[in-house]
Amino acid sequence: MSRGGGSYGEVGQKIDYVFKVVLIGDSAVGKSQLLARFARNEFNLDSKATIGVEFQTRTLHIDARTVKAQIWDTAGQERYRAVTSAYYRGAVGAMLVYDITKRQSFDHVARWLEELRGHADKNIVIMLIGNKSDLGTLRVVPTEDAKEFAERENLFFMETSALESTNVENAFMTVLTEIYRIVSKKNLVANEEVDSSGNSSLLKGTKIVVPGQEPAPPTKASCCMS
């Protein structure tokens, strides 16, 4: 499957799909910086902790389809163990982030994954991200530890640097392309289900939507390790 490029804010274009992806993980692991790098190609060294609900969008083109990625940040709620079920509702992808220089942030990954799977669709596409790879001399989480965890839990895995923009695009696009592949496959199967009168259950234009938009058929994804 070809991977599409992305725009940082085109207006008036037809959107084929809206995919909600959530960022989760301990505070100060760089979730907001990853979001800023992917959504706006920005990085702010003076970035303060995120306060309030926040999400950003980026329009992408995958296999000649226009996809709007809606990426949600925990908005600092994780500091108070206050991430709510509403945050996860409607998500078809998740970026589970830890800091390679903070062992505790990796040790908490299992708890975050349990919470995610307790609130989201059981087959949500998940990417485990070891952020701050630019700080390799301060590393305390071996890459192999994270790889083994990802393989055991059937997750994608990459190490990233929001500062240097290393693998940020790859990580998000891997998740979004996998979601698109799954949705496209479901649509293809549905389109082949033609009843005796010749009508097909065509799903072209179906969106995977987020709370506050019109309802759409539920999606199920299957995760796999790349």
Curated annotation (Swiss-Prot):
Keywords assigned by UniProt, alphabetized: Cell membrane, GTP-binding, Lipoprotein, Membrane, Nucleotide-binding, Prenylation
GO cellular component: endosome; Golgi apparatus; plasma membrane
Residues involved in GTP binding: 25-32, 73-77, 131-134
InterPro entries per UniProt: P-loop_NTPase, Rab_GTPases_membrane_traffic, Small_GTP-bd, Small_GTPase
Pfam families: Ras (PF00071)
Residues anchoring lipid (S-geranylgeranyl cysteine): C223, C224
Domain of life: Eukaryota
The keyword Lipoprotein belongs to this UniProt entry's keyword annotation: yes
GO molecular function, one term: GTPase activity
Topology with respect to the bilayer: Lipid-anchor
Chain positions of motif Effector region: 47-55
Principal subcellular localisation of the protein: membrane
PANTHER family listed in its UniProt record: DRAB11-RELATED
Role summary: May play an important role in plant growth and development.
Protein name: Ras-related protein RGP1
